[in-house]
Amino acid sequence: MTNITLSTQHYRIHRSDVEPVKEKTTEKDIFAKSITAVRNSFISLSTSLSDRFSLHQQTDIPTTHFHRGNASEGRAVLTSKTVKDFMLQKLNSLDIKGNASKDPAYARQTCEAILSAVYSNNKDQCCKLLISKGVSITPFLKEIGEAAQNAGLPGEIKNGVFTPGGAGANPFVVPLIASASIKYPHMFINHNQQVSFKAYAEKIVMKEVTPLFNKGTMPTPQQFQLTIENIANKYLQNAS
C-alpha cells in the first residue's frame, strides 16, 4: 500500500525574469505588472483581484543589518529576514482581510482563487505519481473535478471532467516572490533560499486568508488538499 503526502511545488526565480525593461520602470510598476500577469491566468477571477492589488502598491524601505567589528563595518548586509520582512510588508499592504470584510464578492473570489491553486498544484503532483505507478489518471481527474465542483469552485465540464476556471498558481504567493526577487535578486540565486522564501510566502498568505474560509461554506485549503490526497491514495491502493 502506498500513501502520499504532497509537498508544495517549488518555483525557481530566474535572473532573466527580473531583467529591467528599457523604459524607466519603478519597483511599484514591476510589482503591478507581475500581479497582472499572474491574475490573467485566473480567467473569471483575474480582473477583480488584479484591481484590488493595484490599489495597494507601495514602495517599502527594507530592513537592513550591519556587520560590526570587521572590515565591512558600516555596510548594510542583506539577510533572509530582510527579504521576509519585505514580503510581509507587501502582503500587509494588500489588506486582504480588510477588503474581504467590506466586499463579500472579493472574499469569495479570493477563496476561489486559493482553492483553485491548491487544485492545480496537487492535481499535477498526484497525476505524476499515478502515472509512475502505471495507474490511469482519467478516473482520478474526474473524481477530483467533482470534489472541486462540490467545494463551490466555478469552472466547466470538458469530456466529462470538471475543471476549475481559475486553476493555476497562487495569486498572492507568486507576486510576493516576484516582487522580492526583483528588489533583492542576489538573495534568490541560491536554490535553498528560493525554497525557503517560497515556503515563507505560502505560510503568511495562508495565515492571512484562512479566516475567510472559516466565515464561509467552502472547505479550507488544508481540507481541500486532504480530499485530493485521499482520492489519489484510493487509486494507488487499488493498483497495489
From Swiss-Prot:
The keyword Ribosomal protein is annotated on this UniProt entry: no
Pfam families the UniProt entry points to: SecIII_SopE_N (PF05364), SopE_GEF (PF07487)
SUPFAM superfamilies with a match to the protein in the record: SopE-like GEF domain
A single GO cellular-component term on record: extracellular region
Domain of life: Bacteria
Sorted UniProt keywords: GTPase activation, Guanine-nucleotide releasing factor, Secreted, Virulence
A biological process term (GO) from this entry: actin cytoskeleton organization
Compartments where found: Secreted
Cystine crosslinks: none
Region ranges (GEF catalytic domain): 78-240
Entry annotated with the keyword Ribonucleoprotein: no
Effect caused by changing Q125H: In strain: F98
Extra information: SopE2 is highly conserved among Salmonella isolates of the SARA collection.
Family from the record: Belongs to the GEF (guanine exchange factor) SopE family.
Protein name: Guanine nucleotide exchange factor sopE2
Organism listed in the record: Salmonella typhimurium (strain LT2 / SGSC1412 / ATCC 700720)
Organism phylogeny: Bacteria, Pseudomonadati, Pseudomonadota, Gammaproteobacteria, Enterobacterales
